[in-house]
A protein has these predicted regions:
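Carbohydrate transferase catalytic cores enriched for Leloir-type hexosyltransferases
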Residues: 1-349
């Protein structure tokens, strides 16, 4: 008989957000039976919006009470077997005082453990008093959890250092390649390179600007640098078409919990030039990694792409086999087996 998972989060973030997407994919895969031996019991969440005071009250007071009551009712009523909280920013919701197993997905620890990477501050180094209290509640919640499920090896190692007695499992994100291999249409011309992400400093788009400035003039004349997210908004279908049309995704980030654009690009057959930093260096094929601050290495890699584009007669690229093969390693079947093993371990210990 399948064990029933009660999924818990805070605000009902949409699929378009990073944490929202991960949550919805977990819901979908539980419903589809893609985690062997487990099925969805229910989802506990609240609506978003409201003024700052309303949001604080909901986060710190009303929703934790709602979750506690719902967990009690589900366990007592026999409709759920354990609780899974779908991101570390909701770890304060780990039930206290209830005899129920609980796991938490940890996407990253940037805010709980801010750091400086290659001179760039990652995470909030100066939280205000309210946020400091909130972070303490999150730490306490993670300490109460029976299992932490990390989406990367690098974050898992941090978890083991912070909570050395806590069981930690690694379950990388997975991807369904089919939508990424349906040929799309987008009006991009010339020598196309992509960046995907926000303008926040850790994404290091300023480094890409420096690399572009250092390119030979003939490469710059042909270059069509498309900055998705920070400058240009695309639909999901348009983004897939952009990956298919691009010579490469440029991903110089100083730090990621996972680096989903890297996996998406490879699933679409798009090569990647990525900084050799965690955790996206666990995702990209090793041949696609570059020293994060070596501008010359990035310039030379782009020149090679430009030469290949010229030799091809400036035709759009064909899907890159290295990218496709690497993306295939992050398949949903393996993901489901690893998630099931993580859940199983809570009941074995």
């Amino acid at each position: 008989m399948a064990r029933r998972v009660l999924l818990v989060r805070g605000g009902a973030l949409p699929r378009q957000s990073g944490l929202g997407r991960a949550h919805h994919e977990l819901v979908d895969r539980l419903k589809a039976g893609q985690i062997p031996g487990y099925e969805l019991a229910d989802v506990i969440e609240h609506s978003t919006g409201g003024n700052p005071l309303q949001r604080w009250w909901r986060r710190r007071k009303s929703h934790p009470k709602t979750v506690h009551r719902a967990v009690w009712d589900a366990i007592d009523g026999g409709t759920a077997d354990f609780v899974h909280i779908t991101d570390q920013e909701q770890a304060h919701l780990v039930p206290a005082g209830l005899e129920v197993a609980c796991s938490v997905t940890v996407h990253d620890l940037f805010h709980l453990s801010p750091r400086t990477i290659i001179g760039i501050e990652v995470g909030d180094h100066a939280p205000n008093g309210t946020r400091k209290k909130d972070l303490n509640h999150l730490r306490n919640g993670l300490a109460r959890a029976d299992m932490l499920i990390s989406i990367s090896e690098s974050t898992a190692e941090e978890c083991r250092e912070l909570w050395p007695e806590k069981p930690v499992s690694v379950v990388h994100h997975a991807i369904d390649p089919e939508p990424y291999q349906i040929e799309g249409e987008i009006g991009l011309r010339n020598f196309v390179l992509l960046t995907v992400g926000s303008n926040e400093p850790r994404k290091r788009l300023d480094f890409i600007d420096e690399v572009v400035d250092a390119l030979p003039q003939d490469v710059r004349n042909d270059l069509n640098l498309v900055k998705v997210g920070s400058h240009l908004k695309l639909s999901d279908d348009e983004l897939i078409a952009a990956y298919q049309r691009a010579e490469a995704l440029l991903f110089p980030s100083a730090g990621e919990g996972f680096g989903l654009p890297v996996l998406e690009a490879m699933a679409a057959g798009c090569p990647v030039l990525a900084s050799d930093l965690g955790a996206h260096n666990e995702v990209a094929d090793p041949s696609m990694l570059l020293p994060p601050t070596d501008k010359t290495a990035w310039v030379n890699a782009i020149i090679e792409l430009h030469e290949a584009w010229k030799e091809r007669g400036e035709e759009p690229p064909k899907p890159d086999k290295t990218a496709l093969n690497r993306a295939a390693e992050f398949n949903i079947e393996d993901w489901g087996e690893k998630m099931a093993a993580a859940y199983d371990s809570m009941f074995e210990n």
